[in-house]
Amino acid sequence: QGSGRIKLNDGRLVRLGYAGQNGHDYKSIGPYFKEYNATGINSALDMIEWLHRNPQDSRKIIERNQSYVFFRTINGDGPIGAQGISLIPERSIAIDKAIYPYGTPIWIDTSLPKTRNYIERKYRRLFIAQDTGGAIKGAIRGDIFFGHGKRGEELACYMNNKGKQYALFPKSVKIPNYYRTH
């Protein structure tokens, strides 16, 4: 997660934005939960909760991923995407910047996942490519910014549904060869 909000012990809310990465490739910690006989790990939210319930083992698992992200405090409503502007819940999407330029409109046709509190349902809408991330590689991967709060966290943690995406280019733009062959 490249940015977000944290609540300090004194109750203040601080916004954080991406400031850099240590250069190591991202490695999912998901497979390591089996070594600790963790059951029922089906989403990122399940992983987070297990790590909180098992502090004696959490550091050992987290350190398996040598990729670290550094943050800075930011002003405004945040979070700020890689494009340099505030992300809009359920309208901003993170993409592979080597394939899609920031600002590209992308139509998404997928479904929202079944979660603890929501049923699976169709989800179709227009997004704008405004962010990127270390795990987003290729034309068929995108991460929707669902916003803050319990709903946003739950949807983001469970979302792994397949779907279709359509990059929308004006007629006047010469479409790169990559898009013609994929």
Can you name each region flagged by the protein language model?
Residues 1-182:
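Solvent-exposed, well-ordered loop and adjacent helix/strand elements within mature globular domains
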